[in-house]
Amino acid sequence: MHDPKEYLNQIRYTNQEIQSRVEERNELRQAVMIKTSSFQTDKVQESGTSNFDDKYMKFIEVSEDINEQVDKIFDLRLRVSNEIDRLEKPEHRIILRMRYINLKTFEEIAVSMCYDIRQIHRLHGNALQEFVTKCHGMS
């Protein structure tokens, strides 16, 4: 069995990966747009076309990777949400859902639930223990 925090944090890490790939795609889009505008003002040379094609293909490749990651995070969120639903205590479900699905900080959770931050940390630890007990089939 995986460490429950590591397992649950997959959503956070996948989300960060997607965000970094989106930034990469935006930079590639900008490079393609700059190249496109230079095509409109200059005569197109064969090597320029090849360079443009390479950039455009990289842009398409990154876009496809992002789509795959979005599908992955969607499935992961559903699976984790269903596992969290197995917990008996509503506070545990709320804390784990806010922390690992909604990607909230402990401080944001404390404010939202009107609890002291120490209480949130204690409840989070209890929620993780219940998660391990109820969701022993983590993959």
What spans do the regions from the language model cover?
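N-terminal interaction/assembly modules
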Residues: M1-R86, T133-S139
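N-terminal positioning helix adjacent to the helix-turn-helix/winged-helix DNA-binding module
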Residues: L76-R79, P90-H92, L123
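Short amphipathic alpha helix immediately N-terminal
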Residues: E88-N102
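Generic structural marker for isolated residues within well-ordered, non-membrane alpha-helices
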Residues: F106, L128
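Short alpha-helical "recognition helix" segments of helix-turn-helix
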Residues: E108-M113
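Key DNA-contact positions within bacterial/archaeal DNA-binding proteins
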Residues: R118
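DNA major-groove recognition helix of helix-turn-helix
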Residues: H124, F131
